[in-house]
A protein has these predicted regions:
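Membrane-proximal helix-turn-helix segments that form the acceptor-binding/catalytic region
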Residues: 75-81, 108-115, 145-182
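Short N-terminal targeting/anchoring amphipathic segment
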Residues: 2-6, 81-105, 119-123
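N-terminal subdomain of nucleotide-sugar transferases
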Residues: 1-43, 115
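Acceptor-binding helix/loop patch of EC 2.4 sugar-transfer enzymes
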Residues: 42, 122-166
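A conserved catalytic-core segment of Leloir-type glycosyltransferases
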Residues: 32-72
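A short, active-site helix/loop in glycosyltransferases that binds the activated sugar's phosphate group
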Residues: 131, 160-202, 245, 249
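Conserved donor-binding/catalytic core segment of Leloir-type glycosyltransferases
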Residues: 202-208, 212-238, 244-247
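A conserved nucleotide-sugar
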Residues: 224, 241-272
Length: 275
């Protein structure tokens, strides 16, 4: 089959692509690099106007004319690759807003992909309307919004997550669900909000390419090294404050036996070789 994967979070689509290629399928991966992680793409989409003077221009144009030039730039880049993005048997989106655009532009990009290809599927992976709504209504004992509810993080720090509750994102959600063949959860956080939904296909855990990691016996003759990788942007939502408190206790209790290595915001290729 010819398969098109749109977007990337936490190397999920890269790992899936490697497995699909081994099974004999043709696969194209298009997307952003997932921020500082810089995952490889077949067709790389650059998110422009996000820093310096260009960001100021973007903010000015949006405030005055409600035009998001960053989203329009992403849409133009997608359409430039039209030849490579058409005629696939299956398209899978990593998220309802796989390329981090405004909802209006995300809808147009979604329509472009679904009209130019055959079957369209969606992953519930990362923040989306249903999972954020479920968390906001406190239907989970713990969720990505628990730090917000407990006052550890502000509304401003959670504005990206909370934006999935606004009318524009809700409209995008309903439009996408109307036109997809099905939706797949990648984790329990996304499985629970989707239970009993007519288009829910079930939970498929994140795939891992085990051939990239050699299994070696654990040797603990010297110090036990504990590696902690932090995404600063999601510090509280990922529970890093709890990890750091626990590691401090262990390190203090066993100073001769424990060594803790903590890194922040490393590109994936550097991160994976750091421990």
């Amino acid at each position: 089959m010819k398969i098109l994967l749109v977007g990337e979070y936490s190397r999920l689509h890269n790992s899936l692509k490697e497995g699909l290629l081994k099974l004999g399928h043709q696969v194209v991966l298009i997307g952003l690099e997932d921020g500082f992680k810089k995952y490889p793409m077949d067709l790389l989409i650059q998110k422009k106007y996000d820093s310096g003077f260009l960001k100021k221009i973007k903010i000015f144009l949006y405030r005055i004319f409600r035009i998001d030039i960053s989203s329009l730039s992403i849409e133009r880049q997608v359409r430039k690759h039209q030849k490579e993005l058409t005629g696939h048997d299956v398209v899978q989106f990593i998220n309802e807003n796989a390329l981090s655009c405004s909802p209006k532009v995300a809808k147009r990009i979604f329509d472009f992909f679904r009209k130019e290809n055959k079957k369209t599927f969606l992953l519930s992976c990362g923040t989306d309307h249903l999972s954020v709504k479920y968390a906001f209504e406190k239907k989970l004992r713990y969720s990505l919004l628990t730090p917000y509810f407990n006052g550890k993080s502000s509304k401003s720090e959670n504005r990206f997550v909370l934006s999935y509750l606004d009318r524009a994102h809700e409209s995008l959600h309903h439009w996408i669900f109307k036109h997809i063949e099905g939706v797949i959860a990648s984790d329990l956080d996304y499985h629970l909000p989707l239970k009993n939904h007519p288009k829910y296909k079930g939970c498929v855990p994140n795939c891992i390419n085990t051939s990239l990691f050699e299994a070696t016996p654990l040797k603990t003759a010297g110090k036990i090294r504990i590696f902690h990788g932090i995404n600063k942007e999601n510090y509280y939502r990922k529970g890093n404050d709890f990890f750091e408190k626990a590691l401090a206790i262990v390190e203090k209790k066993y100073p001769e036996r424990i060594e803790v290595l903590t890194v922040s915001n490393l590109p994936y290729d550097v991160y994976i070789k750091s421990y």
